[in-house]
Amino acid sequence: METNDLGFVASLMFILVPAIFLIVLYIGTNRSEA
């Protein structure tokens, strides 16, 4: 079973980085409004 680790990590980062950015941005706006 051959897996492309680099492609897996790249796709994982492609999903996680925007998700983390949106979560941080969401928490930041909630704290500023509260």
From Swiss-Prot:
It is a single-pass membrane protein. The keyword Thylakoid applies. It is found in: Cellular thylakoid membrane. InterPro entries: PSII_PsbM, PSII_PsbM_sf. It comes from the Bacteria. One of its GO terms (cellular component) is photosystem II. The chain crosses the membrane at residues 7-27. Pfam families: PsbM. The keyword Thylakoid applies. Keywords: Membrane, Photosynthesis, Photosystem II, Reaction center, Thylakoid, Transmembrane, Transmembrane helix. One of its GO terms (biological process) is photosynthesis, light reaction. Belongs to the PsbM family. PSII is composed of 1 copy each of membrane proteins PsbA, PsbB, PsbC, PsbD, PsbE, PsbF, PsbH, PsbI, PsbJ, PsbK, PsbL, PsbM, PsbT, PsbX, PsbY, PsbZ, Psb30/Ycf12, peripheral proteins PsbO, CyanoQ (PsbQ), PsbU, PsbV and a large number of cofactors. It forms dimeric complexes. One of the components of the core complex of photosystem II (PSII). PSII is a light-driven water:plastoquinone oxidoreductase that uses light energy to abstract electrons from H(2)O, generating O(2) and a proton gradient subsequently used for ATP formation. It consists of a core antenna complex that captures photons, and an electron transfer chain that converts photonic excitation into a charge separation. This subunit is found at the monomer-monomer interface. HAMAP family: PSII_PsbM. This is Photosystem II reaction center protein M. It comes from Synechococcus sp. (strain CC9902).
